Amino acid sequence: YSSLREELSEAGGAVIDLSGFPNLSESVIHGLAVVASGFLPARAPVLLMDGVDHTERLLRITAELGLAGAIVDVKTIGSAPAIAALPTVGIVLSKQKSEMSVLLRIDWTPSSSDILTVVAAGMHGILSEPFLGQSEPPPTTVKKIATTLDTDIQFREKEMRGWLQQMGAANLNDLKRHHLRSVTYEAAAMSGLRLEGYRQPLPMWSRK
């Protein structure tokens, strides 16, 4: 307990991973959040994290506690799970009235299209380890890591600016779900996005 207090007192924030404690009651989760907030420096953020199957509960508890945000964890390699999570996260977010940051945690290096898709769905960004899935060995020194990340970020920014212009959005803040299109039937069926060339989502998403 004392070591936890000491560590958190010097931390910039805390993430409580609920997936590691699947049987915790909501009262215990509330208690953990209160303890973390009390031990952290003033204004340091506390976030909750859980799997995409528990998105509704995750965001509800985050809102009730007035925490800084939530992390929706998608653990399957590939872009399909992120697409499949869009309807669930988007619907739950639309019901939330409180201000919070919502991030999508993935276990692959996101492409520019992944980033735009997640932001258009109403989330605020992607959480991922750098250099995942690369064929070349990752840089090891601080200087090389910083240089590589800076180059990668600049490339993605340039690529995303071009796509935003094509979609008619001035910046990321203007990007909405209706700007997105699916290029395959499978992606359209999973996400509820409109298939390229069609004005409406697929029938299973259009039914009321």
Describe the role of every protein-language-model region:
Residues 1-107, 112-140, 196:
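Alpha/beta enzyme core
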Residues 91-101, 112-116, 120-208:
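Alpha/beta catalytic cores of nucleotide-metabolism and tRNA/nucleoside-modifying enzymes
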